[in-house]
């Protein structure tokens, strides 16, 4: 069973519906102990880095998530769920992310319309794994004001541009995390969700 981490920070129903659409066995997870037996974990998120990181601790998800990530099992982070994998964010000095990846999150340079919201194309380093079948230059839906800056640039799996180039996807083993919203990105987003479901053992098919 794929578990979607429900910590009160995201459009979870859309993610759930997207995975159900491609045939995944999936449910919302409000009990952190269920992560230990998951076939895969989806970690969405929207909103404040500080609030979300505090909620993960208060609800008991922080340490089980770290333990799950340390085992290199199928994991998909979405939007704030990508940013929280890193250690820190300029949005909330002093707040701690999960620290699964070394690096921080930076705000777009002054002068841009914030948040970066709408459809934008991505460039991929690889079209293997969760990006299999996704064409170079495909458009995905973004809503964010910050973006990740990994210390290890080899983890970057994709880039996009908003007057400056930024990392929009990372991969490390069975961990994939994206800044865009696959659940809002129509056919290509469903393709990515189907690829994740297959990695988790589901007999999934992109719609």
Model-derived features with residue positions:
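N-terminal beta1-alpha1 ligand-phosphate binding loop
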Residues: 2-24, 182-184
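Structural signature of beta-strand start/N-cap positions in the alpha/beta core
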Residues: 25, 40, 74-76, 139
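Short acidic low-complexity segments
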Residues: 26-37
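Structural motif
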Residues: 42-44
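Cysteine-nucleophile active-site neighborhood
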Residues: 47-119
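Pocket-forming structural segment of enzyme catalytic cores
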Residues: 87-163
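Short, surface-exposed beta-strand/loop micro-motifs that present aromatic residues
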Residues: 164-171
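Acyltransferase
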Residues: 178-207
């Amino acid at each position: 069973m794929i578990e979607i981490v429900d910590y009160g920070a995201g459009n979870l129903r859309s993610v759930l519906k997207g995975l159900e659409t491609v045939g995944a066995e999936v449910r919302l997870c409000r009990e952190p102990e269920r992560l230990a037996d998951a076939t895969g974990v989806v970690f969405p998120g929207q909103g404040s880095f500080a609030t979300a990181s505090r909620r993960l601790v208060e609800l008991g998800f922080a340490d089980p998530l770290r333990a799950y990530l340390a085992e290199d099992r199928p994991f998909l982070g979405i939007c704030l769920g990508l940013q929280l994998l890193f250690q820190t964010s300029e949005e909330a000095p002093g707040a701690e992310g999960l620290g699964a990846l070394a690096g921080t999150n930076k705000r777009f340079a002054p002068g841009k319309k914030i948040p970066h919201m709408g459809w934008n194309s991505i460039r991929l380093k690889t079209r293997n794994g969760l990006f299999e079948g996704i064409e170079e230059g495909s458009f995905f839906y973004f809503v964010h004001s910050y973006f990740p800056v990994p210390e290890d640039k080899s983890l970057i799996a994709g880039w996009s541009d908003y007057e400056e180039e930024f990392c929009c996807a990372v991969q490390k083993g069975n961990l994939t995390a994206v800044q865009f919203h696959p659940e809002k990105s129509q056919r290509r987003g469903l393709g990515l969700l189907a690829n994740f479901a297959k990695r988790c053992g589901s007999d999934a098919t992109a719609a």
